[in-house]
Amino acid sequence: MPDSTSSASRGGVRIARGASPWLLPTVATAALSLARARKSGRWAAVAVPTTALAAGMLWFFRDPEREITDGRVISPADGVVQSIMPWKDGRTRVAIFMSPLNVHVNRAPLAGTVTSVEHIPGGFVPAFNKESENNERVVWHFDTELGDIEMVQIAGAVARRIVPYLPEGTKVEQGERIGLIRFGSRVDIYLPEGIDVAVEVGQATTAGVTRIDRD
């Protein structure tokens, strides 16, 4: 089993693009309540939960630097492998569940060109539920050395907004940041026929680090 942490994040940690609508109001409220808490007990009572919430938001939207692993296909998401399923067209789908505690920035599994980015409206049931197949999603297609690679970002019960970073036609490097799913959710990657899967159900993955395929 590959080690998903051997090339873990190095260097600084920044805030993910697309976090502002949630993060800025929360941090501003926490800062205001802390400033007024010195003069008012009522504001002191407000400062505790708002500061805790702001700290949680900063953690949720962290975007650490990564040393990208060498390999044909690397994980697009931090999380846990939820399922590995043979698909009707010969491909293999690897589904990675992202909890609210994981990094929510997704990365390109291979180098190539973005040939399609399609937003599909849908529901918001928990991403580990079978009904999540009908959730809101963004479907990516990449033209790579292995041919067409499909990756799907799926919104969950908490994560109700997917933020793609790149438009169609963009050339990407392996491990490059391509989008954000706010809070918890799921990412599926479809491996072409003939590509062996290196991960196992229940294995932790790190975006840009864990190798998905086997030589």
From Swiss-Prot:
Requisite cofactors: pyruvate
Substrates-to-products reaction catalysed: a 1,2-diacyl-sn-glycero-3-phospho-L-serine + H(+) = a 1,2-diacyl-sn-glycero-3-phosphoethanolamine + CO2
Entries under InterPro entries matching the protein: PS_Dcarbxylase (IPR003817), PSD-A (IPR033175)
Localisation: Cell membrane
TM regions (residue ranges): none
Residues recorded as bearing Pyruvic acid (Ser) in the entry: S185
Protein topology in the membrane: Peripheral membrane protein
Site label Cleavage (non-hydrolytic), positions: G184, S185
One cellular component (GO) term of this entry: plasma membrane
Note on how the cofactor is bound: Binds 1 pyruvoyl group covalently per subunit.
Enzyme class: lyase
Active-site residues, as the UniProt record annotates them: S185
Alphabetical UniProt keywords: Cell membrane, Decarboxylase, Lipid biosynthesis, Lipid metabolism, Lyase, Membrane, Phospholipid biosynthesis, Phospholipid metabolism, Pyruvate, Zymogen
Pathway the protein acts in: Phospholipid metabolism; phosphatidylethanolamine biosynthesis; phosphatidylethanolamine from CDP-diacylglycerol: step 2/2
Assembly: Heterodimer of a large membrane-associated beta subunit and a small pyruvoyl-containing alpha subunit.
Role this protein plays: Catalyzes the formation of phosphatidylethanolamine (PtdEtn) from phosphatidylserine (PtdSer).
HAMAP family, per the entry: PS_decarb_PSD_A
Family the UniProt entry places it in: Belongs to the phosphatidylserine decarboxylase family. PSD-A subfamily.
PANTHER family: ARCHAETIDYLSERINE DECARBOXYLASE PROENZYME-RELATED (PTHR35809:SF1)
Name the record gives this protein: Phosphatidylserine decarboxylase proenzyme
Protein encoded by which gene: psd
